């Protein structure tokens, strides 16, 4: 049975919610799924003053965890059109795994959130996907079998490069039903691909 890691960073909880939906989809495909987060780098007093969601249930991942999975699905909110520094810092520490080829052939994917419709969703996904390709991973996006990303009837995230959500400038908007459906679809598709490749 394929093992899937949903690895995320979430400052305000939106990506945490998306990560849970991604995991639901992967489990639906029959994979064993773990959800882990990367360490917070912001000092605790600053994080509290900024109303960061610090009470997240997922355990903190270690770099060595990455080698133990057949698929790794990475999610983080955007920071000025790229992945958050917390996720970048974590992935930057994977050089030893990269040097050994320990991630070659694993299945990867990306998901993200932005405050606005044009706040850098695709560039943030690309910043994650670039890392996955350098690691030697097979990247799976959110294909157009998910019709929800074609809708014009509502403001919604979703791109062929990965599932996305919009939060609003004040963070009040939570992932919509359509966005969560996209996250589940991507999780299921990635898990199905991992099962085909790794059993």
Swiss-Prot record:
Please list the cofactors this protein needs: FMN
Annotated binding of substrate, by residue? 98
Q: Which residues bind FMN?
A: 10-15, 78-80, 113-119, 134
UniProt-listed Enzyme Commission number(s)? 1.6.5.2
Q: Does the keyword Cytoplasm apply?
A: no
For this chain, one GO molecular function annotation is:
FMN binding
Q: Which residues form the Flavodoxin-like domain?
A: 4-190
The reply on keyword Transport is no
Quote the record's cofactor note. Answer: Binds 1 FMN per monomer.
Q: Which UniProt keywords apply?
A: Flavoprotein, FMN, NAD, NADP, Nucleotide-binding, Oxidoreductase
List the catalysed reactions: a quinone + NADH + H(+) = a quinol + NAD(+); a quinone + NADPH + H(+) = a quinol + NADP(+)
Q: Which SUPFAM superfamilies match?
A: Flavoproteins (SSF52218)
**Ligand binding (NAD(+)):** 12
GO cellular component, as recorded: membrane
- Superkingdom of the organism of origin: Bacteria
The entry assigns this protein to a family as follows: Belongs to the WrbA family.
- Name the PANTHER family for this protein: FLAVODOXIN-RELATED PROTEIN WRBA-RELATED, FLAVOPROTEIN-LIKE PROTEIN YCP4-RELATED
Output the NCBIfam families linked to this UniProt entry: flav_wrbA, PRK03767.1
Record's protein name: NAD(P)H dehydrogenase (quinone)
Originating species: Rhodopseudomonas palustris (strain HaA2)
């Amino acid at each position: 049975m394929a093992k899937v890691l949903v690895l995320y960073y979430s400052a305000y909880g939106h990506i945490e919610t998306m990560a849970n939906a991604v995991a639901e989809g992967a489990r639906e495909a029959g994979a064993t799924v773990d959800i882990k987060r990367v360490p917070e780098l912001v000092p605790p007093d600053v994080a509290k003053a900024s109303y960061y969601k610090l009470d997240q249930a997922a355990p903190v991942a270690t770099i060595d965890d990455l080698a133990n999975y057949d698929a790794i699905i990475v999610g983080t909110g955007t920071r000025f059109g790229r992945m958050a520094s917390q996720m970048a810092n974590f992935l930057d520490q994977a050089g030893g795994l990269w040097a050994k080829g320990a991630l070659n052939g694993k299945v990867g994917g990306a998901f993200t959130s932005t405050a606005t419709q044009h706040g850098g969703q695709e560039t943030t996904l690309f910043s994650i996907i670039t890392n996955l390709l350098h690691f030697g991973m097979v990247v799976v996006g959110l294909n157009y079998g998910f019709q929800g990303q074609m809708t014009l009837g509502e403001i919604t995230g979703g791109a062929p490069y990965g599932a996305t959500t919009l939060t609003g400038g004040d963070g009040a908007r939570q992932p919509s039903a359509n966005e969560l459906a996209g996250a589940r679809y991507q999780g299921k598709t990635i898990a199905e691909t991992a099962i085909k490749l790794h059993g």
